[in-house]
Structure formats: structure tokens, C-alpha cells
Amino acid sequence: VLDKVGQDRGAALAFAELIAVDPSHPDVIAPAERVVLGFGADAEVMIALSASLLRVAEQRPPDEPPFEKGPAHLAAGAAQRCFEGLGAAERTDPAIGGYLQINLADSLRMMGPEHDEDAMQAYQLALAIDGNNGWWWFQLGLLHKWRGRFREALDANQKAFARLSRAASQASEGARPSLKPVLWNLAISATALGEGKLALEAWEQLGVRGSLSGAGLPYVADMPAMQLRVATLGEETGRNDPLPQKAVTFEVLWVQPLSPCHGVVQSPTVRRASVDYGDVVLWDGAPVRMNEVEGRAVPVFPLLWILRPGAEKRLRFVGMEKTRGTIEALAGELGDEVELSVFDRRTPDAEGNTIFYGKLLIAGDADLSRVRQALETALRARQGLTLAVPSLYELLGDTPAAGKAHQAWGGIERAAEKLGLLPRG
């Protein structure tokens, strides 16, 4: 089929069907370009091809940067040029001009925020052609959701739900559209807006029972821990990060769900991120992958929004110890308001010396002077353990002590370098 797609219309349509069924097919772009060259003015072929290319583009999670020139770009160009070649009657035909415009709009959405203005125009034109198509309203809602415009996302999904519900009531049982994606996005948008009652109504239609929390958000009890993927940048303090400071990467954090789409971050970030331990966050309903953790499949969801920053103070530290576990033993002496998280511990040398990095996680209402006293007392009682937490003294307004802590940080890293625990700078 692939060697004929640019000359044989049947082969072109068969190719579009192939990649719709198998969007991970390794050979897509070059044959698709030949189809566009051969049948760019054929609306049926371009509708099928652009829709299939969108399935390919969807294989890349929406929290990842789009390809500079990928399947969405090819679909957008094909749909746009074909639409421009239509006659007036075809342009306003939902089955022709309408589908070309919605495929163009979806392609532009997947190409990134810099194309949002053109995407909005394409969605508006598609809906002007056929405002009764519930799925087109749903797709407009996806654009608004991923750009953080949750009021507009809620409005679009409510319109989608009304139209698809009406279509479902008129269809035979086997032909009824699934309302699940729309209900999920209704719940997500309502949660983002603090409209907990509306979110609960959507969850209940999906068979999820919950209640309203004191904050007016949905609460579903006994949900298992899940994971959240967040983009991170380098931290300007410390040499534990092997990546360049401006390199963007992902970290996977544990979250405790409060509902199927929001919850509290339970692990601190290693690098700098928009979220951290204690934040209440919103995530999308489609996991980017599944992780196997202790025999359980754990979904990893992409971050959508921060609903409420946590009150906790997350203070970075660096330390060295001669006996493994000394720093963890110290944590028990800092009080119930303080947790200690070590996320990077280097392999010890022959004498057992090791360097480690982590964060102190301090309750928002904790007395920092008491934490300082407890920390300094515990450190004095432990030979072979050194720790530098400059930001603790900065928060206390003790500039001289903060300066000494910064110097201690550098001293710890230089000592680790001499021992071969860190690469030489």
C-alpha cells in the first residue's frame, strides 16, 4: 500500500485507515506527505488523513512540548489547503468543511499555545458550521482546559454534554455516544473553579460517590496513592544535579488523591518545579504512563494546575555522614512538625563517608526558632554528621548565620569532591 498512496486513491484511504488503527506505526510522515501531494484537493481523503494524523499526534502526551514539524503540523496544512479549495456549498457542509475545520483546529491545539489564536478561529468556524456537534464542543473544551481557561472549558463541556445527551437519548443502545470523556472534563473544570457540587454531580454520573470537603471541593474517600508528572528545571544551589541548569526534564511525584482529578503532593521535588510537597494540585484524567510499584500498577497523571499552594516550608540541605542512617536518626529529634527527605545519597567511600541532598519539610505554622534550636542541638550530639540548611536562617532573618550556612554548603561539597564522592568541578 505505502508505495502507491500518492497515486491510488484507494491506497491513500487504506493508509489513513491503517494509521488510525495503529497510530504508533513507525512509517507515517513520508507516506502521508505523498498522500497530500497526490490528493490534497480531495476532501474525503484529506479528512480521513488529517483525522488519522491527529491520532498519531495524540501519542505524544499533552504535557510534553510538541514536535517542531510533526503529524499535527502536516494535518493542519492539509486540512487548511483543502478547505481553501472548496466551493461555497462544501465549505458550509458539516461533513466536508466542518470536519476539515475541526481537524485543523485540533491540529493547531496540539501544535502548542503559540497557535491558540488560529485554533480558536478554526473551532469557532467549525461550530458556526455545525453548532449541534457535541464532540466539537468537547474538543474546544480540551483547548481551554490545557491553557488553564477553566470557565471557558466548563462552558464548552456543558454544551457538549447537553448535545451528546440528546443524541444518546435518540440513538439505539449500541450507537449511543459515551459521555465519560465529557463528564471527566466537566468534573476537572468544576474542581478547578471551586464548584464542588457540580464536580460531584459529574462524578456521581460516572459511578464515583463522594462528598463536599470543608473547602467546597469534592472529596472521595480511600483512594489509593497515585503519581504526578511535573516539568522541572535545575536548582541554582548544589552540585547534585547532573543536568544543565536550564535543562527541562520531568519528575514523578507521589500524590494522595482527594478526588479522581485532584489531591495533595506527598513527595518533594529534587529540581525546581512549579509544585512541591503539600501543594493541592489538579491533574488530567488520562495517564501518561503506568508505573509498576511493589506489584501494583500506579497511574502517572500530567499536571494541569495548582489549586492551592501548600503552607509547608521546603528547605534544601546538603550534608555528609560517616555512618549511614545518621541523618534519618536525627529527623526523629526535630519534632512532629518536621519531616526530613533525603533524595540523593552518593555511594560511600571506603571509610563510609557519603554526601547527601534533601529537603526539610516544615509545617506552615511551626516555630522556626524552635526548629533551629532542635536541629543545632541534634547536630552537636552527632559526631561525623554535618548539615547545611541556609534557607532556614534566611527565613529567620539571621543574615550572618545564613552566610555561614552557605559557606558550609560549599565546604561540604569541596570535602566530598576531595573524597571522590562528587566529580571535580
Describe each model-derived feature in a short phrase:
Residues 1, 31-34, 48, 68, ...:
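"A position-specific structural signal for the A-helix of alpha-solenoid helical repeats
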Residues 2, 36, 53, 73, ...:
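Residue at a conserved register position within TPR or TPR-like alpha-solenoid repeats
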Residues 5, 39, 56, 76, ...:
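Structural motif corresponding to the intra-repeat A-B loop/turn of tetratricopeptide repeats
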Residues 8, 25, 42-43, 72, ...:
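TPR-repeat structural position
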Residues 18, 35, 53, 82-90, ...:
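Canonical positions in the second alpha-helix
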Residues 23, 40, 58, 94-95, ...:
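Short coil turns that delineate tetratricopeptide repeat
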Residues 27, 44, 64, 95-99, ...:
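Start-of-helix register in tetratricopeptide repeats
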